[in-house]
Amino acid sequence: MNEFINIFSSSDPENVSSTVKLLLLLTVFSVAPGILILMTCFTRIVIVLSFVRTSLATQSMPPNQVLIGLALFLTFFIMAPTFSEINKEALTPLMDNKISLDEAYTKAEEPIKEFMSKHTRQKDLALFMNYAKMDKPESLKDIPLTTMVPAFAISELKTAFQIGFMIFIPFLIIDMVVASVLMSMGMMMLPPVMISLPFKILLFVLVDGWYLIVKSLLQSF
């Protein structure tokens, strides 16, 4: 314990460098959930997967752990080029003491800004820029993350809900057909969802639904 305290109180350059790296690592771990949710494609993916489960009316199948796990790995797959660039341009030089912490932050935010800008609607970005009374930026570097992140988040929410609406349509039709058949047969006390569930699962399996959903998500980026 004393050795750990001495690292923070030491003025030796090597110890100071180790202290900065440790603090940086702890900071990254503390803000990682927020970064993952709001600055990557995780938001769109997890919402679409949740819409799939809701439209099928399977309640807790697949479980939340499976959906979140799949969303995480899809996020890492889609964001791999961006993460690689951040590691190459910012993290590795910082760990090698070739650049300062401020330079590493500047270099790290460029790839993530570029990714977010590709999937952010101009209307959403203009909303936050106008509210902050910002001048029209000359380049992407002039847009702060405090403006880009919320604009990107609401753009992702809108896109995810649009995809979710398209997913709901075929299953809604099945529910309506089953409900009409049950009413015509006088079986109004029987829940239509109970009867339509096997047909919805059958349709989803026959069209290879998970493949189509994941393919659509990958192509949307």
UniProtKB/Swiss-Prot annotation:
Q: Where are the transmembrane segments?
A: 22-42, 66-86, 163-183, 187-207
Question: What's this protein's family per the entry?
Answer: Belongs to the FliP/MopC/SpaP family.
What Pfam families does the record point to? FliP
Q: Does the keyword S-adenosyl-L-methionine apply?
A: no
Origin organism is Bacillus subtilis (strain 168)
Membrane topology per record:
Multi-pass membrane protein
PROSITE patterns named among the record's database cross-references = FLIP_1, FLIP_2
Superkingdom is Bacteria
Which cysteines in this chain are paired by disulphide bridges? none
**Alphabetized UniProt keyword annotations:** Bacterial flagellum, Bacterial flagellum biogenesis, Bacterial flagellum protein export, Cell membrane, Membrane, Protein transport, Transmembrane, Transmembrane helix, Transport
Q: Which Gene Ontology BP annotations are present? A: bacterial-type flagellum assembly; bacterial-type flagellum-dependent swarming motility; protein secretion
- Function of the protein: Plays a role in the flagellum-specific transport system.
Q: What is this protein called?
A: Flagellar biosynthetic protein FliP
- Cellular compartment(s): Cell membrane; Bacterial flagellum basal body
Output the PANTHER family linked to this UniProt entry: FLAGELLAR BIOSYNTHETIC PROTEIN FLIP
Q: Name one GO cellular component term.
A: bacterial-type flagellum basal body
